Amino acid sequence: MDVNSRLSVQSNVESPLMPEDSEPQQITSSAAGSLAGSITACKKVLRSNSLLESTDYWLQNQRTPCQIGFVEDESENCASVCFVNLDVNKDGCSTENLQQKLVNVSPDLPKLINSMNVQKPKENEIVLLSGLASGNRQADFDVSQCPWLPDICLVQCARGNRPNSTNCIIFEINKFLIGLEVVQERQLHLETSVLKLEDDTNCSLSSIEEDFLTASEHLEEEIEVEDCKSGLETINVSANVLESKRPKEATQEGWDYHKEILHCALGEKHIRKHRMPSMKTERSKENTAENTALQSLNPSARPSRLKSEVAGSKQPATNYSYPENIRGEIETSQMLFIPRDAYLSMVSSCGVLTEQGSNHRDHDATPNSLPPVQNGEATAGEYATNLAESVMQDAFIRLSQSQPTLPQESAVSFSVGSALLPSGCCTKDMVVPRSWNELPKIVIVQSPEGSDTAPEPSVSSWPDLEVSVETPGIFSEESSSRPTQSALEVALACAATVIGTTSSPQATERFTMEQESLVSTYTQRGNGIQQTPVPRVFMGPSTTEYSFPSALCGMTQVASAVAVCGLGEREEVTYSVAPSDLLPTPGASEERSSIGSLVTEESTELGKEAIAEALLREATLVLARPNAYSSVGELLESVNRRIIETTSKTQMLCTENVRRNELAHTLSNVILKHSIDELHQKNIMAHPTEERHPGGTLNTLMESVNQLLHNVMCFTFRKMNHIVTLGEHPSFDKAAGHAWVKASACSSSHPSSNAHGTGLVIRDLVEDASPKPDKGGARPELVNNPRLQSEFSCSHRMLDSTARTFPKEMYPKGIVGEDTRNPLHTLSYDSSEQRTSTDIGKLTTVGEVRSTFQESEDSIVPKAQEKHTCATTLNNEAQINLSLLGDDLVVPDQSTLEAKQSEVYGITNFAEELAETVVSMATEIAAICLDNSHGKQPWFCAWKRGNEFLMTPNASCRSLKRKKENSGTGSTVRKHKPPRLSEIKRKADEHPELKEKLMNRVMDESMNLEDIPDSVSTFANEVAAKIMNLTEFSTVDGVWQTQSCSRNRLLGGDRWNRLKASSCESIPEEDSEARVFVNSLGLMSTLSQPVSRASSVSKQSSCESITDEFSRFMVKQMENEGRGFELLLDYYAGKNASSILNSAIQQACQKNDHLNVRPSCPSKQSSTESITEEFYKYMLRDIAKENKDGALSRRSSHDWSTGLLSPSARSPLCYRQSSMPDSRSPCSRLTVNAPIKANSLDGFAQNCPQDSINVQPVSRASSSGLCKSDSCLYRRSGTDQITNMLIHETWASSIEALMRKNKIIADDGEAANASPGPVSGGSPSQVEKCANRLVTGTGHKGPALLVQESVDYQRKDAVTEGNCSPVSSPSKMAPVKKPSGFDPTRETSACHNAVALKSPRRSLCSREVPLIQIETDQKEECVGESETLLPQSGSLEEAEGPQPEETIPDVARSEDTALSACQSSQDSLETREELEVDVLKEDITLDESRNPPSSSEESTGSWSQLANEEDNPDDTSSFLQLSERSMSNGNTSGTSSLGIMDLDIYQESIPSSPMINELVEEKEILKEQSESVKERASGLPGRAASPQRSLLVINFDLEPECPDAELRATLQWIAASELGIPTIYFKKSQESRIEKFLDVVKLVHQKSWKVGDIFHAVVQYCKMHAEQKEGTPSLFDWLLELG
């Protein structure tokens, strides 16, 4: 290769493209980036284990589709992505043609693609190239400059052979996700700073570049000539960290772009190594060395797959800057000028070599004169290299996928002649050259610099090491992202490198020469660690020659030894000893050969156990005494000697005492189980297409077991060392005994808190024994945690290893708990833990762990307790450990669980957790109760905490629980008999698994079930009973029966008065499922009215904040019920929630009159009387009034019962998401149709302007990411906030709102009372004011959002019902809408539609409102920005001038949307209504679906305005147009009714509201909108996860007829929606079927389809397509037909 080509190897980073995919894409980025314009190539491999790979996830995806826009080909003001589809049907296609096509995209493309052709991207792979020159212009990172994007994604269409496979579709979506996300990130980077990566490393790119440039100047002299000759630009191959900035799992497969690219694109270039983080460097070294070593493009270069790959990018040869090199390297290492080629191979092998060596200062020291190796000199060595590489490749890939990477600190470099400079090492360390066939020495160097960066992620000892600046940046990223590399991995890498270098003679020769010149030894102090120079050693061996086979054998041996000893890794890291400087001693090579021969000749004779034992002993020695060997040579000698010795005594190996054997078996079982689980998981996660070979399985198992054993050894020895060390203080035995005694005492006294006790003991012990109590007890509270785990969980980040180790040492539990996330720390002791380790990145959820734990417990340590006891008697360390271990295993039941939980969540999180639990439970319960109208008791499937995995609910368990009650109840609504505490306990006892699961929820050691005061339990039961009796539950079931309605009313009223206000109001629930909303909403509203109607108001009032009461009650409940009985808590919370919900619904249900508060309401006394009471009374009155109205109420009730959609089918199991919503995981969503969460009070207050509660399903947008059950709660802000909101915001705001409302009610209420419909005459202004307040206040909190949605519906309703009375219409509308509930996503806000009462159907129809929602969503999204959005809305409203001026100002203030609503004329309303009706018709049959469009204009005006306040500015008419427009316009809110997107959409749509005016204006509007949208997007909070930026998607096909353009566009639409991109644009010229696409978009918005709906439709289409083959309509046509 040309000497000039410069390779900068960068760490692979995996970016979590999807919020969902925690490890969905393992991305190996091999990028080449040159300083000036570098091309970055990053290959991402989609992994099947990603959430995004889950069909369920997509089918249940509730995100709102983003908007679609089309732009003229010229427009370039938008970030863009080009998806290049490399699929070609016939290879016969003229290559030149294809090449030309690629050149059109970018002149760089053909070269890059050719270089990749060796390994064409597979279906699950996507290659991201950025920095390519644009086809017609200079590529510039400035997107506006580049017609193509900075990111060109090369995708091989996955649809080729399996066009109909769902997996294919998902893969495609994920590819698009990756591409789009990369562009988003790039935009962010560009905006924030291109140097972010460097910022991380604390060195700016420029500074690094300068350093390198300086260094390179020296090289330039040599290189320039060559460069000129070659005329090639050097390609900077550096993984663009910027690009792949997100460090993810270290496990990434990479392509060796650099290999191929280097070969192809770079051709001959000098590869300058950029210093990579050592970890990475090693890999990259191997990869690059091998890759670069190959002068040819041999596929063998594949090592590229190694995680670290280098991508080649072009850069002027003169550009020698090593952006990635960090200054530190400059300081510490001397710049080695390695002959380009030799270095190439060497460097690639060293990865870091040159960089390390490239310290500018040193650079002069190194001879620049090294002659470059001739490219032509490649010899048979290449063949060997390729062979070796291919052989090693699989291992590397496997390793990269499954194991953490090496600790950055210790870079183990095996390089030819150890030329490899350890990354921290000076090049001076370079070894003397050997002949090419001579086996290279292994140089293990600890990079002092690298260690710094790695510290947090890597082993605790790191802190001791210095990290060179160069490594840090990348390093830190990598290290932080990935666990340290396993020894095996390192060994393999070394072996591969060695083999590669060995096989490449030229490189070796070169290297030899260089080494000779550089023989000078260099001692480097890494943090005071001295590395002894061993360079001369190499010289001696250089004379020896090895045959390739022997070399391989030798290398294998060395690798094995190294792997076993873990020299390269942990020991060094842990002890911060620098075995790293173990350079091979002169004898090393001989040893190697001897070992090789020994192995080859005697391996059959040696007892396997003997060899294993010998290696193990060496490993233990190394671990226990890191300084035992001064060099690898010594180690090898020792290993050799030991193997021979042990072989002779094989027979003695198995003599173990019985107890030890038992323990060994136990551990063996645990480890094996864990390994198998891991393997299983891997298999599952592996790409479906990958085949499983038995050999691979065995390898994987071995690998897993080795890792576990290694970890166990490391921990054991580390701890042993600590104990021994500590033993100097209190005697070891004493300490151990002391710890044990204390632990045992604790455990005996409190079995459940055993872990806890132990932790304390350990802490004490640490304090006594450890001179460094600060370390040992660094985090006492953690120590207290049952498992010191939390304390240790930081381990990789880390406490001093000693600190962690000590307590863990003392207490295995700690060990087990150590760091489940860090595979290094996982102990095989605990199966559950192991499982965790398997997940590494993810802790298994507690429940899972629990179950596993139990299994392991049963299978493994049935007698753990006994062992434990035995152990107590023993004083020696081993026994202590055993006992501890046993204890660990044994205790699983509570202490372990608790411990686990605490490990995962610190005690500090308990309160938060509790709150979350309460909230989520309440929501869930309400949902379940609603679901269980048949008297089933809500048994919750435990939601496993920890990883936020859904624990599969115990279906049988739940069904059993429910069955009992089912049998008697039938469909009629029966009172739900609340389970008594005793009953719950009994059931829990009967179903231990259930109990266990329940216990996962809230476990506070401090709680004692026994303390439950009777009064509390009584109250709880009472509340539960009342709640259970509430109609909601039964009604929501969707089995609404008229009789049940009446009955419900009676029951409801009764209950209401009896229920304590606090309990009733306790938790408002929000529904995350928009669809569910529709149904449940309607039901709920219906239910609620009857419920409240019959009752008397509860007299429990007290101005005391409901919040206080509620929170007190809940806390009490929790404390009392405690632990395993969260069930009760759930019950109560649920009941409270449901009651609140009921009340809210009732309000909503009080159809038109809701809003009109009658003077009779106690509103005036709000200050003194409990707001709750007033609220209820008020509701009751409304109900009564409605009853009087008769026709209305009857109609409404009828509508409710008949017209309500039955709740959408619920998944049989209700998954309770721990209150942590996992927006990503489909499971996280409760499938249960959440009852509409009326923010009971919140909604009420917000809607109070309308005087009706908006029982609006929370807008999809906000909730989309949340679990259905909890989403409402979470939607708004996230767990913490949720809790806050629940208790404080919700209550406070609702109370406040209620008070205001009451006042309002007092003023206007009388009027309202006078005339339920029209009476509200004066209320509008008040309502508006209130609404404004609510909007501004609540908007932020999220109620506003709800209101907005509801407003949309209501607005329609209001408009329709405007006739009745503009003022009253709002209230009417609200009820109607609620009934309509129709808008699954929309909240039907009673507030908005007084009219709704009249047109319940319409409210159903209001579905369309979702379009309006667009603006609403904006508000929601804007909640933070609500005010800004509102102004926009205001403008819209103004635009919609028709709205009554009087209302407009207020409305505008409160919500511009309201204005727009007002604005909409009756016609528009009618139209909209019709549309809505049509939409509703699908779901709703209400005859009333259309309310008379006759609603008076005035009513529409005032109401509309009011509605608009909450509704989107878009009026029904404008909105409808908008929706159409939005459909057509990418900018307009394509997802008006879609949740989150709505906001974005709103943002866009608001600006685009004018667009709504005419479709004709779409194009222009699109442009304007896109601009405005962009502006807004930037301003809008949008999704935190993704920048709200619009993207231009360009699709480029080598063969245009290949892909299904419509399908692709649809999938891209889905991907963009998933990422929260507000709008994606397509080039008009590319999207031939623009009109149809726009129609489809319009349809989707009209139908309020979510991403999941679109995905489902696509899947159906593909299936159909597969079946019919011919005559299938195009996707768009089919969708339109479907619609």
Curated annotation (Swiss-Prot):
<keyword id="KW-0963">Cytoplasm</keyword>
<keyword id="KW-0597">Phosphoprotein</keyword>
<feature type="compositionally biased region" description="Polar residues">
    <location>
        <begin position="289"/>
        <end position="301"/>
    </location>
</feature>
<dbReference type="InterPro" id="IPR018292">
    <property type="entry name" value="AKAP_110_C"/>
</dbReference>
<feature type="modified residue" description="Phosphoserine">
    <location>
        <position position="1006"/>
    </location>
</feature>
<feature type="modified residue" description="Phosphoserine">
    <location>
        <position position="1240"/>
    </location>
</feature>
<feature type="region of interest" description="Disordered">
    <location>
        <begin position="1359"/>
        <end position="1387"/>
    </location>
</feature>
<feature type="modified residue" description="Phosphoserine">
    <location>
        <position position="1105"/>
    </location>
</feature>
<dbReference type="InterPro" id="IPR008382">
    <property type="entry name" value="SPHK1-interactor_AKAP_110"/>
</dbReference>
<feature type="compositionally biased region" description="Polar residues">
    <location>
        <begin position="1"/>
        <end position="14"/>
    </location>
</feature>
<feature type="region of interest" description="Disordered">
    <location>
        <begin position="960"/>
        <end position="983"/>
    </location>
</feature>
<feature type="modified residue" description="Phosphoserine">
    <location>
        <position position="1102"/>
    </location>
</feature>
<dbReference type="GO" id="GO:0051018">
    <property type="term" value="F:protein kinase A binding"/>
</dbReference>
<feature type="modified residue" description="Phosphoserine">
    <location>
        <position position="1101"/>
    </location>
</feature>
<feature type="region of interest" description="Disordered">
    <location>
        <begin position="1"/>
        <end position="30"/>
    </location>
</feature>
<feature type="compositionally biased region" description="Polar residues">
    <location>
        <begin position="1362"/>
        <end position="1371"/>
    </location>
</feature>
<dbReference type="GO" id="GO:0005739">
    <property type="term" value="C:mitochondrion"/>
</dbReference>
<feature type="region of interest" description="Disordered">
    <location>
        <begin position="275"/>
        <end position="320"/>
    </location>
</feature>
<dbReference type="GO" id="GO:0005737">
    <property type="term" value="C:cytoplasm"/>
</dbReference>
<dbReference type="Pfam" id="PF05716">
    <property type="entry name" value="AKAP_110"/>
</dbReference>
<dbReference type="GO" id="GO:0030018">
    <property type="term" value="C:Z disc"/>
</dbReference>
<feature type="compositionally biased region" description="Basic and acidic residues">
    <location>
        <begin position="1469"/>
        <end position="1490"/>
    </location>
</feature>
<feature type="modified residue" description="Phosphoserine">
    <location>
        <position position="1066"/>
    </location>
</feature>
<comment type="function">
    <text>Anchoring protein that binds preferentially to the type I regulatory subunit of c-AMP-dependent protein kinase (PKA type I) and targets it to distinct subcellular compartments. May act as a converging factor linking cAMP and sphingosine signaling pathways. Plays a regulatory role in the modulation of SPHK1.</text>
</comment>
<comment type="subunit">
    <text>Interacts (via the PKA-RII subunit binding domain) with the RI subunit of PKA. Interacts with SPHK1; the interaction greatly reduces SPHK1 activity.</text>
</comment>
<feature type="region of interest" description="Disordered">
    <location>
        <begin position="1415"/>
        <end position="1518"/>
    </location>
</feature>
<feature type="region of interest" description="PKA-RII subunit binding domain">
    <location>
        <begin position="910"/>
        <end position="927"/>
    </location>
</feature>
<feature type="compositionally biased region" description="Low complexity">
    <location>
        <begin position="1492"/>
        <end position="1504"/>
    </location>
</feature>
<comment type="similarity">
    <text>Belongs to the AKAP110 family.</text>
</comment>
<protein>
    <recommendedName>
        <fullName>A-kinase anchor protein SPHKAP</fullName>
    </recommendedName>
</protein>
<feature type="region of interest" description="Disordered">
    <location>
        <begin position="582"/>
        <end position="601"/>
    </location>
</feature>
<feature type="modified residue" description="Phosphoserine">
    <location>
        <position position="1269"/>
    </location>
</feature>
<feature type="modified residue" description="Phosphoserine">
    <location>
        <position position="1088"/>
    </location>
</feature>
